[in-house]
Every structure is written in structure tokens, then in C-alpha cells.
Curated annotation (Swiss-Prot):
SMART domains listed in its UniProt record: DKCLD, PUA
Name of the protein this chain belongs to: Probable tRNA pseudouridine synthase B
Organism, scientific name: Methanosarcina barkeri (strain Fusaro / DSM 804)
Its biological purpose: Could be responsible for synthesis of pseudouridine from uracil-55 in the psi GC loop of transfer RNAs.
Annotated active site: 78
Length: 338
């Protein structure tokens, strides 16, 4: 389990250096310094979803406000649920799957069908941490089979009569409505979810929330007055959406190879996450902090630090355009056929 109040995505990540390198300022761009149109098309906005609309409706409104090519949210919230709805814009939407798989935190109001001793309520809630079995609700978009989901932490915040306010950190795909039902069953009195708000989603927290009105105001300020300050505040670089993933930092000379579909060779690495595991999803970055691709690690950190040749990672989703950095590789070297 995670430390109290922490999702796995909030674990501190340490980079270890494999080899020295420098980055050419003539190529690429630091994410926060991208030209405004590119900044928006490669951005993410942490929307505070109001009660009422569906998640898809909110994403459609974001798309309409900004005039972007597309917008995709990272994890649906039911119409009555409020809170974090990270919405990726334009080219950044290719990173949506990486964010959807990250852990989530909610604050929930549970209504018990009968007032129960507070000590018992707290004890039963504690028992719902760790792996739990869940059957998706009847009104669900997924096949109804029993699944295992992990509850990282569950903290009872307040009990008043038959109402229980709690905070829960859980694996993606956990049904909080079903969790409330199961807690009620375990207490022997029954219960249901009264209200729900999402407070964390992967690397996103309530500290960076913006409303749809905030977004609209920032857009109007930019379009009518030429002031980019607010639009750059409410929209974050797409790199924020994958900041929770283990990472490898690339040499400038390796970047275009990845953009062209090649696997990452060991010589292209300058630094890497201290705890990479073979087979896990990782993010490949430039020395300027730009996201190049999502990839699958082909070696662990220990193996990579010892290796001088071989394939370090294979791309899953390429995020950067070919030609952003100059070619510094050969097709033969990287295994790309002519």
C-alpha cells in the first residue's frame, strides 16, 4: 500500500545519470516557452467539473472554447459527480491512456441506512484498504465480471449520525458507488453513495483546478487583448500529464530516431529513473523537458546502467513531430528499414 494520503503517482522519483550531454538551443523548445498556438495544441487543462453535465460534454465545451482540433478527458465522472477532469488538448490527447491508468482520489459522503457506532464504522472502513473484489454496476460500460482493485488508503474524515465523510485513494477503475454499498453490507445496515468529488487524478490535484468560465475568460483575454499570461496559467504543458511516469532523458541525437519510429538504443540515454522496471510504461523526454514518446522499458535501471549497447525501450505512442531535432542516427544503427 501507499503511504497515508499518497497515490502511487505521487511517489518521489529520482533520476540517475548515465552519461553527460548538452542540448542545442536551436532545436525544440522548453515546454513552457512554446509559441502560444503550439502551447495550446500540446496542453492540458485541469477542469473543475460541475454537477450536471457528462464528462464528454465538458470535454466538448473545452474544445469549443479553445477551438482546438480535439480534446479528451482522462477518466469519466458521472453527471452528478464533481471535481478533477484533466482534459488533454489537440496533439496531447495521445497521452490520455497513460493518465487514465493512474490512481485517483475522491472525497465521498456515504449515507448509512441506519446509525451505527462510530468505532465500528471506522474499523470496517479500515478493512477496505488493500486489494478488494468488485463487480461493476449494472449500468456500466464494461463487462460485468468480478475484478480486483486496490484501495491505497481510506480515511474517515467525519461521522455525523448516519452520514460518513471519507477520503479514498484508489486504483483506476474502482467504483466508489459500489465501495459504499459494500461498506454498508459489511456493517450490516446497508448504505449508498450520497455525494462524490474527485480530488486527485494521477499528478493533478485541486491546487491547479480551473473552471470552464476561467478558461473562457483566459481565452478572451488572449484573443482580444493579446495577453497570453492567463491562458498559459490555466493550460499546462502536456508533459504535466505524464509527470507521474518513470522517465528516460534522451540525447538530442537520439530524439529524431524515436520520432521516426525507432526503438531507443542504450547510447541515446543521458539519464533515467532510478527504479525502472522491465515491461512498464515510461515516458521519453528531451534534455529540455519535452515529451518525445510513451514507451515500454526493455531493461531495468540496473541493466541499463551496466549496458553500453542494446534496446532500452520501444515506443508505444510517439508525441513529437519528425524533424523537431536534427537526425543524429543511422537507419541501420536503429533497426529502421529503408
Amino acid at each position: 500500500m501507499s503511504p497515508a494520503g499518497k497515490l502511487p503517482s505521487e511517489a518521489e522519483r529520482i533520476l540517475v545519470r548515465k552519461s553527460g550531454a548538452w542540448t542545442n538551443p536551436s532545436y525544440g523548445s522548453y515546454p513552457e516557452k512554446r509559441p502560444i498556438l503550439e502551447y495550446i495544441e500540446k496542453g492540458v487543462v485541469n477542469i473543475d467539473k460541475p454537477k450536471g453535465p457528462t464528462s464528454h460534454e465538458v470535454a466538448a465545451w473545452v474544445k469549443a472554447i479553445l477551438g482546438v482540433s480535439t480534446a479528451g478527458h482522462a477518466g469519466s465522472l458521472d453527471p452528478k459527480v464533481t471535481g478533477l477532469l484533466p482534459t488533454l488538448l489537440g496533439k496531447a490527447t495521445k497521452a490520455v491512456p497513460a493518465l487514465r491508468l493512474s490512481g485517483k482520489e475522491y472525497v465521498c459522503l456515504l449515507k448509512l441506512h441506519k446509525e451505527m457506532p462510530q468505532k465500528l464504522v471506522r474499523k470496517v472502513c479500515e478493512e477496505f484498504t488493500g486489494p478488494i473484489y468488485q463487480m461493476p454496476p449494472i449500468k456500466s460500460a464494461v463487462k460485468r465480471v468480478i475484478r480486483i482493485r486496490t484501495i491505497y488508503y481510506l480515511e474517515v474524515l467525519e461521522i455525523e449520525g448516519s452520514f460518513v465523510l471519507f477520503r479514498v485513494g484508489c486504483e483506476a477503475g474502482t467504483y466508489i458507488r459500489k465501495l459504499c454499498h459494500d461498506i454498508g453490507l459489511a456493517l450490516g445496515c446497508g448504505g449508498h453513495m450520497q455525494e462524490l468529488r474527485r480530488t486527485k487524478a494521477g499528478p493533478f490535484t485541486e491546487e491547479t483546478l480551473v473552471t470552464l468560465q476561467d478558461l473562457k475568460d483566459a481565452y478572451v483575454l488572449w484573443k482580444e487583448d493579446g495577453d497570453e499570461s492567463e491562458i498559459r496559467r490555466v493550460i499546462m504543458p502536456m508533459e504535466t500529464a505524464v509527470s507521474h511516469l518513470p522517465k528516460i532523458i534522451l540525447r538530442d541525437s537520439a530524439v529524431d530516431a524515436i520520432c521516426s519510429g525507432a526503438a531507443l538504443a542504450v547510447p541515446g540515454i543521458t539519464s533515467l529513473d532510478a527504479n525502472l522496471k522491465k515491461g512498464e510504461l515510461i515516458a521519453l523526454f528531451t534534455l529540455k523537458g519535452e515529451l518525445v514518446a510513451l514507451a515500454k522499458a526493455e531493461m531495468s535501471t540496473e541493466e541499463l546502467l551496466k549496458a553500453s549497447t542494446g534496446l532500452a525501450a520501444t515506443s508505444v505512442r510517439i508525441m513529437m513531430e519528425i524533424g523537431t531535432y536534427p537526425k543524429g542516427w543511422t537507419k541501420k544503427e536503429y533497426g529502421v528499414e529503408s
